Amino acid sequence: MAKSFTGRKRIRKSFGRIPEVTRMPNLIEVQRSSYDHFLQMDVPPEKRANVGLQEVFRSVFPIKDFSERAVLDFVRYELEQPKYDVEECQQRGMTFAAPLKVTLRLTVFDVDEDTGLRSIRDIKEQDVYMGDMPLMTANGTFIINGTERVIVSQMHRSPGVFFDHDKGKTHSSGKYLFAARVIPYRGSWLDFEFDAKDIVYVRIDRRRKLPATTLLYALDGADSAELRAERRALGKDLLPYEAQGMAKEEILGYFYETITYQRAADGWKTGFDAERMKGQKLLTDLVDARTGEVLASRDTKLTPRLIRKLQDQGLQEIKVAIEDIIGRYLAIDIIDEKTGEVIYEAGDELSATALERLEKMGVEELPVLNVDHLNIGAYIRNTMAADRNASREDALIDIYRVMRPGEPPTLESAEALFAGLFFDQERYDLSAVGRVKMNARLGFETDDQMRVLRKEDILKILKILVELKDGRGEIDDIDHLGNRRVRSVGELMENQYRVGLLRMERAIRERMSSVEIDTVMPHDLINAKPAAAAVREFFGSSQLSQFMDQTNPLSEITHKRRLSALGPGGLTRERAGFEVRDVHPTHYGRICPIETPEGPNIGLINSLATYARVNQYGFIESPYRKVIDGRVTDEVVYLSAMEEGRYTVAEANAPLDAGNRFADPLVSCRKGGEYLLVRPDMIDLIDVSPKQLVSVAAALIPFLENDDANRALMGSNMQRQAVPLIKADSPLVGTGMEATVARDSGVTIVTRRAGIVDQVDATRIVIRATEDTDPAAPGVDIYNLLKFQRSNQNTCINQKPLVKVGDRVQKGDIIADGPSTDLGELALGRNVLVAFMPWNGYNFEDSILISERIVRDDVFTSIHIEEFEVMARDTKLGQEEITRDIPNVGEEALKNLDEAGIVYIGAEVRPGDILVGKVTPKGESPMTPEEKLLRAIFGEKASDVRDTSLRLPPGVAGTVVEVRVFSRRGVDKDERALAIERAEIEKLAKDRDDEKAILERSFYTRLKELLLGQTSVSGPKGMKGGETITDETLAGLTRGQWRHISVENDQVMEIIEQTGKVFDDSVQRLQERFENKVEKLQRGDELPPGVMKMVKVFVAVKRKLQPGDKMAGRHGNKGVISRITPIEDMPYLEDGRNVDIVLNPLGVPSRMNVGQILETHLGWAAAGIGRQIGEMLDRMRAATVEAADKARTAEDLKERLRSIYGEAVYESDIAPMSEAQLMELAGNLRRGIPFATPVFDGAREDDICRMLEAAGLDRSGQSTLIDGRTGEPFDRRVTVGYIYMLKLHHLVDDKIHARSIGPYSLVTQQPLGGKAQFGGQRFGEMEVWALEAYGAAYTLQEMLTVKSDDVSGRTKVYEAIVRGDDNFEAGIPESFNVLVKELRSLGLNVELNQRTY
C-alpha cells in the first residue's frame, strides 16, 4: 500500500498476520451521517426524502382552522448561509447556526352554506423565518454559545413487541407469569399479562388492568370491518352505534381449533384426528364408531406407529364417552330454533345437565373448543368468562373509564378515545423500525409505512402470548442488540423539533380562528419561538448534549462514539439492573466489552466498536467476510445482531492456507450466542479483523490480549485523560491504529487537494493545487494553523507544519501535526526508560520514582491555557470603566498594563497581578468633616469609584498569550481593540494577497502557454498584427497587456477568454470574502444585555512534572509520583545510561496486566535497533568518510531495514526512496524502530525474542543495573526497557489549595468549601470526637468559634495578631444563633442567659 507523505517519514513495522480486507469506517461517521440525514442540506428541496426535518414538517402540516375554511401547507424549507463561521462563533461566544427559512402556503376556501361544497378563494405563499438551526462542524461537534459540544447517541429499547415473564418473582408459588408489551416510537404502551389465576389482562399506558377480551370486544368484528372499508372508500365512516365488536364466536374461533361431536345411535362420535391425538394417553377405551370394536384399551399411549396402524385399518370415526364431553367448552352459540333464544353461549362449559338438554332438543352436531388443559389451556375462554363486558359499547366505555377516570363517558367520546389510542397516525407511531421488528416477531409482511396497530397485530400478539404459556416458543431477550437501537443526533433533534412544532401548531390553529383570515399572510399566523426554544433547550440543557471532552484527540473521538443508555426516554442509574449493564454475546463487533466508566455508570455508557456502523433503522451493524464452500472471499457484508444470529461465524484469527481455505478440520465458531466447533464447509462468515470487537481506545493498547479486562478498562479510560505534552512522541510499541485516530479526530490538517507547497510558516500553509479541479474552484488552498488555542479542558491546541516549501503532497496527506500527534500519529505520552524494581520504598503502593532528567529536559511538561474574562456593565450608578487609572494602586502593580488598562501579550503574571483594570462607580456616601475640609481647601472631588479589576487567582502563574476585546455596537473602541482589529485585518489582507498572487502566477503561466507560437491579429501599442508570438514578444510587454493580445486561432481565443473570466471571478470572490470578513470585524459585537465591553485574557501556564502528579501506562498501571531523584542517584545500565522511571514489580502479578512487561521488552528491542541505525547514520554523515564507504554503509542500512521490515514493505516503500529520503527515514528511526502489534494479532513471544536478538540484546530482556548511590550492581538482573507513559489530567497544581481567611457562608457564617470557592477545611463531627477523646477542650473551643463562625471573635483575633498579642476570647458561634432562630420559628421562645461563673 502506498504510504502517505508522513507515512514515508517513519514506517511502522507491523507484527499483524491478518491482512486488512476492508478499510475502517471514518471514526466520526456516526455523528456526521446522522445529522446530514436530518438536515438534507445538499439535496434540492424537491428531491428531499421524507426523513428528518422534512418528515417533521410533513407530519405537522397541513394545519387547518377549526371550521376548515383555511389550510396552512408546508412547501419546502431552506437553510441559508451561517452568519459567522466556526472560529468567529468560538471567539464571540455565538452559536454556529444557519437561518431556517420555510416556505408556507395559505389556502382560503369559500364554503357554500347549502351544499357544503368548498371552492378555493385565495392562495398565498410566503417564506417565513423559523429561527436558527445549529450546524455541525466538520469534526462532528456543535458550537453552542461559543463552546464546543457533542450530542451523545442514545441506546434505547427498540419499538416493537416484546414477550417476557417475571422469572417467578411475582407470585409466591414461583409460577411464571408471562407478559407481552407493545412499545411504539410515540404513543400509548399496550401490555398484556397473565395473573396467578391464568386470566389474561390488558393495560394501556400502565393504567388499571382490564380483561384482555374487553380490548377484543372493542375491536371491529369481521362484518363491521368490511362495512367500514366500504364506507371509507366513499369518503365516509361508520357511526359509533352502527359498528359491532368482535363476537365471542369470532374470538374463540381465532384462538382455538374446533372439534365437532356428532350424534350416534348410542351416544356421540367424532372424526379420528391422527395429528391431534398423537402422543396422548387414552383415558377410556378407543372404540371404532362404525364397528364398535375396541381398537386400544385405556391407558395406552398413542405412538406414531400405533396411529399409523389404526389409519391402515381404515379408522375414520371413534366413539366419544359422555365423560369426555362434560367439561368441554362450546365453540358457537346454541340457539333454540323455535324461539330464536340463545340457550348456551359460545365458551360456556358443558355440564351433564346441559348435555341432556341438548340431546332432548335433538341437537345433532356439537362444535366444542379443542382445549385439553395440557397442551392447550383455556386462558382466553376463562378470561371471557371473567369479563363483565360482553359488547362493544360496554368495552369502549370501560376503557374510557380507565383512561379518563372521573369523566362521564358517552359512546362517541369513548370511540374517539379508543381510535386515537392505537389507530390514529397523529397520536400513535410505531415507526418503520417498530413495524419491521413487529413483522419479524409476528411473522407478517406488512409494509413499514403502516405505522399504527391493526386488529391482526393485537390478535397475533395475544395468540403468541397464550402459546408461550402453553410452553411453545421462546421469550425475548431484551438485552439482545436486535432489541436495542441507537438514536443519534439527527433523530434526537427530529423528536425535539417535532415537540416544538406541535406547540406551535396549537397556537397557529387558535390564531387562524381569531384573525380575519382573508387579510393575513402566513408569517402573521406563525410565532417561531416554541420551535426555536425547543432547539435551544435541546442543545443547551439536554442530558445528551455534553460539553466536549477535549483533553486530547482520543478523548474527542471517544466522546463522539459514545453510546449512553441514560437520558430522556432511557434508563436511570438507580433503576438499571445488572443484566442491562452486562456484556451480551451480541455486543461482539458492535459495542466494546472493555471501555465503560468505572462507578455508577458502568455498563450504561458504552463505546462503539472500531468497525461498527449504525444502519438506517438504528441497529448497530458489524462487517463480516463471506465464506463460500469453505473458502474465505474478500466480499464484505454488514449485519445487524438479528441477522447475524442466523449464520455461523468464524473468528478472524482462524488459520487459513494459501488458497484462503481453513487450515484446521474443525474451526471455533459462534452461532446465535453459542460457541461451537464446526467443519469448514458449514461456515457462512468470518470476522473482518481481530480488532473489530473493541473500541478505538482499547484498540490502542498493545498486547491487550495479555491484560486482565479490568485493567484494560482502566487503561482505555486513562488514555483519554492524557495531557498533550510540549513535545509529542509517538509510541515505539503501538498497535497501528495511531495514524487512523490522528487523522479522523480532526486535530491534524489534511490536504483537500494534491499540490505543491508554496509558502509555510508557523501560522499557515499555502499550497498551489496541481489537481485538475472544477474551474470555478480557486487554484490555491490556504490552511491556517491554530496557535496556542484553549481547549474545553484548558489544555493547549497548537498545530505545527510538517512540510517544506516545494514539497509535493497528495490529497489526504497530513501536512500539520496537532496536539498529541507526531508525524500524523497519535502521541499521548512519551517513551521512557523504565526499570521494574523496588527503590527504598519510594515505589510502595504504585508510587512512581522519576529521574530529574525528565523534569530538566521537559519530557512531561505540558502547557495549559486559562481563560479569564471581565465585563464592564452599565450599572444604576453609572457605567463601569476599563481603565489604567485605578484608585489606591501603585505604579508597580500597573507595570503590565497598556494605556487602555489591559495586560500586554507576553507579560509574565503571578497570582494577584492585575490583568484588566476596571473601576465601578460607588454610591455617594456622607462625607466626614476631614473630607469636607480637604475639598474646601483643594477643591478636589474625593474618589467615587472602587477598584473591581480582574486579578489573577491564586495557584495560577504564567504568560499572557492572547487578549480579546469585545465592544457593544455603537460604543467607541479603545486603542487596544483597534490594534487587535488592525492586526486581524492585516492577516486577512495577507491571505488575500498571497492567494491572488498564486492565482495570477498560474493564470499568466497558462496564458503564456496558450499565446506562444500563435499568430497575433492585434495587440497593445507597438505590437503588429500577423507576427508569431515568442518569449521576446511577451517579455517586451507587461503581464497585464498580455490579455489584450488577439490571435488568429478562434479556439485558442475562446480558451483565453474563458480562462480570463474564471480568473476574474476568482479574484472578485476573494475580494468579496475579504470585505465580508473585515465588515464583520469592524461591526460591533453582540454582548449580553447591560454589558458595554468585555475583555478575555488567556494565560498560558507551563506545568512541569512534580511529586503528586498522576501518571499511567496504557495497561491500567497508574500511580502518583513520589519523588524526583537526582540523575546521579538513579540506577544506571552498564553503558552508563540512567533509567528514567522506576516502577514497582509487585504492581504486575496481582493486577494481571502482563502486557506492560511485553511492551517493555519490545520497546527495549525497538530502541536497541534504533541505536544501531543511528550509528550507521552517523558513519554516513561523518565528514571524513569516503564516497565508497558511504555507499557501502547506505547499502548496509538498506539491508538492515530489509531484515527488520520484511521483503514486502521494503520493496513497496523503502527501495524506491532517494538518498535524502532514506537519510530522513533513518534519522526518524534512530530513537527506535516503531512497532505495531495489533490487538489479538500482535507480536508473539518468539517475535519479541527475535527482535531482541536483532538488537544484540539478551533474550531475557533483563539487564544488570548499578545503584547510582553506591556504584554497586544490584543483586539480580532487572527488567529494563521502554514503556509508553502518559501524564494524566489530575495535576497536583490543580488540586493543592490553602486558605487563611476568605469568603464565608451568609447564613451560618462558616467558611465555604472547595478550591473553586476559595474555601476552608471542614472540621466535622468526627474531628470533634477526636478532640473530645483527647480532652483538648481549648483547642476544640478555638476550632468551633474563632476559627469558624464566631464573627466578632474572628475580628478580635485578627486585631490581636496585628498587635502581636496572642490572647483571644471565644464568643457565640453564629450557627448557635441560627439554631435559636430555627426554634423561634417553631414558636418556641428560647432566650440565652449569659452568666459568668
From Swiss-Prot:
E.C. number: 2.7.7.6
Any one GO MF annotation of this record: ribonucleoside binding
UniProt keyword list: DNA-directed RNA polymerase, Nucleotidyltransferase, Transcription, Transferase
A Pfam family matched in the record: RNA_pol_Rpb2_7
Matches recorded under InterPro entries: DNA-dir_RNA_pol_bsu_ext_1_sf, DNA-dir_RNA_pol_bsu_external_1, DNA-dir_RNA_pol_su2, DNA-dir_RNAP_su2_dom, DNA-dir_RNAP_su2_hyb_sf, RNA_pol_bsu_bac, RNA_pol_bsu_CS, RNA_pol_bsu_protrusion
UniProt xrefs under Gene3D superfamilies: 2.40.50.100, 2.40.50.150, 3.90.1100.10, DNA-directed RNA polymerase, beta subunit, external 1 domain, DNA-directed RNA polymerase, subunit 2, domain 6, RNA polymerase alpha subunit dimerisation domain, RNA polymerase Rpb2, domain 2
Any single GO BP term: DNA-templated transcription
Disulphide linkage map: none
Catalytic reaction(s) noted: RNA(n) + a ribonucleoside 5'-triphosphate = RNA(n+1) + diphosphate
EC class name: transferase
A single cellular component GO annotation: DNA-directed RNA polymerase complex
Subunit and partners: The RNAP catalytic core consists of 2 alpha, 1 beta, 1 beta' and 1 omega subunit. When a sigma factor is associated with the core the holoenzyme is formed, which can initiate transcription.
NCBIfam families noted in UniProt: PRK00405.1, rpoB
PANTHER family noted in UniProt: DNA-DIRECTED RNA POLYMERASE I SUBUNIT 2
Function: DNA-dependent RNA polymerase catalyzes the transcription of DNA into RNA using the four ribonucleoside triphosphates as substrates.
HAMAP family the record matches: RNApol_bact_RpoB
Sequence similarity: Belongs to the RNA polymerase beta chain family.
Protein name: DNA-directed RNA polymerase subunit beta
Gene source species: Rhodospirillum centenum (strain ATCC 51521 / SW)
Lineage: Bacteria, Pseudomonadati, Pseudomonadota, Alphaproteobacteria, Rhodospirillales
